[in-house]
A protein has these predicted regions:
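Surface-exposed molecular-recognition determinants
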Residues: 1, 5-20, 24-210
Length: 210
């Protein structure tokens, strides 16, 4: 039995009407998404960094961030990174963001931000550190390696508010684009205060074109 997924150039034997033929594994794979990275925190951490994950092999990336808790009431910041391993954060004046979010009381808010050093995943309200509710966020990032246009991202999530006015479940939707046309290679997540708690989990997928 195979101990791992074959490489694209590995050859497999296939029977064609009784005749054995060698076929590259790349011709047998279906379309869909490739799992590129799994991050599970074994201890509290001040940030999550994933480098060398964006390449020309995929145009669209999906992220699933869940079981996320913070040690202090905090915003969650998302930054792109460039330069490969030990890359550089895409920082000052790089992001334009629009957030919409609603509380279970029925109240809703929206927020716009321009020329920030990060994209804000949770709108105006902080995540509540003193809760059993784990935050879950799903994000889609489009073509981060294209140097001819700005990178765009859409996200939506469910969290528990640490805002004293709204201590309740919050649903958020956001979209942003960078104001820097640059080939991005990775990304960083970090809370504005405290740490990510142990067991926070992040899955990163790349979507294939065929």
């Amino acid at each position: 039995a195979l101990g791992a997924t074959p490489a694209d150039t590995d050859e497999l034997l296939v029977s064609d009407a009784g005749t054995l033929k060698r076929v590259d594994f790349s011709h047998l794979k279906g379309g869909g998404m490739d799992l590129l990275n799994v991050t599970t925190l074994g201890a509290d951490a001040s940030e999550i960094i994933v480098d060398n994950v964006f390449t020309s092999s995929h145009d669209i990336y999906r992220f699933f961030l869940y079981n996320m808790k913070t040690s202090a009431n905090a915003d969650i910041h998302f930054q792109l990174r460039y330069g490969g391993a030990s890359g550089t954060n895409e920082g000052s004046n790089a992001y334009v963001t629009r957030n919409h979010y609603a509380y279970n009381s029925g109240d809703g808010q929206q927020q716009n931000s321009h020329n920030d050093g990060y994209a804000l995943l949770n709108g105006w309200t902080d995540l509540d550190a003193n809760t059993d509710y784990g935050t879950s966020v799903e994000m889609t990032l489009f073509d981060p390696v294209d140097t001819e246009k700005y990178t765009t991202l859409m996200a939506h999530g469910t969290m528990y508010s640490g805002d004293g006015s709204y201590n309740e479940v919050v649903n958020t939707m956001m979209g942003w684009f960078t104001s820097k046309a640059r080939s991005q290679t990775g990304f960083r997540l970090h809370p504005s205060a405290g740490n990510f708690k142990q067991y926070t989990k992040l899955l990163t997928y790349g979507m294939k074109l065929s």
